[in-house]
Amino acid sequence: MLVGASVGAAGWFSSQNSEHEGLLAAHEEARQAACAYAPVLADYDAKNLDAYFAKVLDGATGDWRKQFDDTSRELREVLTQGEVVSKADDVQCAIKTGDETSAEAIVVIGQTITSVGTQGKPSPGQLSMIMRMEKTDGRWLVNHVNSPLASVPQQ
């Protein structure tokens, strides 16, 4: 009877360990996807916005895809008028919470912006956000972005 209990306990602990390892692997995949997507958001040139918009939408799904798509015309106008060029310098990411198919990533992007407003001189800055990641068809995509700069005023 003791042997049976030991085998049963070993099996239970083994399954718990496998679930934990699966969760850790999913968190790491989500973190890597968020870190890969951050420069996509922060690297753009007003002279080549079609490629920028395509890359952003390629990594987007759900609410974020709709929000970005809905505001892209206004964003294009502002970036073009301001002759804005942005480059991501450093990206830091961590997973706040999540499971095997969704996660919240805290993302901090160091960026340098050059524009009419900076008189053509590079100006360093930092952008922080929370990305809601969702695993869709085997890919981690961004479903929601919470950032002061990503807020859209309600009309």
Regions found by a protein language model. Give the residues of each.
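Surface-exposed, charged secondary-structure patches
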Residues: 82-117
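Short beta-strand edge/turn micro-motifs at domain boundaries
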Residues: 126-154
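Core segments of small alpha/beta cavity-forming domains
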Residues: 25-85
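Extracytoplasmic
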Residues: 90, 100-102, 124-128, 137
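A short, acidic/glycine-rich surface segment
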Residues: 40, 113-119, 152-153
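Juxtamembrane and targeting peptides
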Residues: 1-43
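Periplasmic/lumenal scaffold domains of single-pass inner-membrane subunits
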Residues: 114-126, 130
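A mature extracytoplasmic/lumenal domain signature
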Residues: 72, 107-111, 146
